[in-house]
């Protein structure tokens, strides 16, 4: 299996409910290592850049507002097939459709407030990681 990295965000709905430790425990129990982590307040510019792929979607403005509404925790996760593994651990975007035991099934409030973001490919993970971390920030 290939060791790879993926990017994660614990969103404002999760940090507001003090779920960082609980979500980190799920991540680590799944065999992923947290090799970089930082709690930040995402700026509007950062959120717009990060979610630029959704700029033409009707929910874009709401998404940017939500992601800047409170602290988030940005993370780099590492492990065997980390991108696919973390997407499995997160669960479906809609928590009502997420599998039992997944982060979104356990902690998400709604489709919009679904607690976590995870990269959808290794290529996007590298781009997303670089928006928030330098290689020196990532310690294995």
From Swiss-Prot:
Q: Where is the active site?
A: 117 (pros-phosphohistidine intermediate)
Give the keywords, sorted.
Answer: ATP-binding, Cytoplasm, Kinase, Magnesium, Metal-binding, Nucleotide metabolism, Nucleotide-binding, Phosphoprotein, Transferase
Q: Where in the cell is it found?
A: Cytoplasm
> Which positions in this protein are listed as binding ATP?
11, 59, 87, 93, 104, 114
Q: Which GO terms describe its molecular function?
A: ATP binding; metal ion binding; nucleoside diphosphate kinase activity
- UniProt keyword Nucleotide-binding present: yes
GO terms under biological process = CTP biosynthetic process; GTP biosynthetic process; UTP biosynthetic process
The chemistry this enzyme catalyses reads: a 2'-deoxyribonucleoside 5'-diphosphate + ATP = a 2'-deoxyribonucleoside 5'-triphosphate + ADP; a ribonucleoside 5'-diphosphate + ATP = a ribonucleoside 5'-triphosphate + ADP
**Cofactor(s) of this protein:** Mg(2+)
InterPro entries noted in UniProt: NDK-like_dom, NDK-like_dom_sf, Nucleoside_diP_kinase
Give the E.C. number(s): 2.7.4.6
Q: Which family does it belong to?
A: Belongs to the NDK family.
Xref: NCBIfam families: PRK00668.1
Tell me the protein's name. Nucleoside diphosphate kinase
Taxonomy-wise, where does this protein's organism fall, top ranks first? Bacteria, Pseudomonadati, Pseudomonadota, Alphaproteobacteria, Hyphomicrobiales
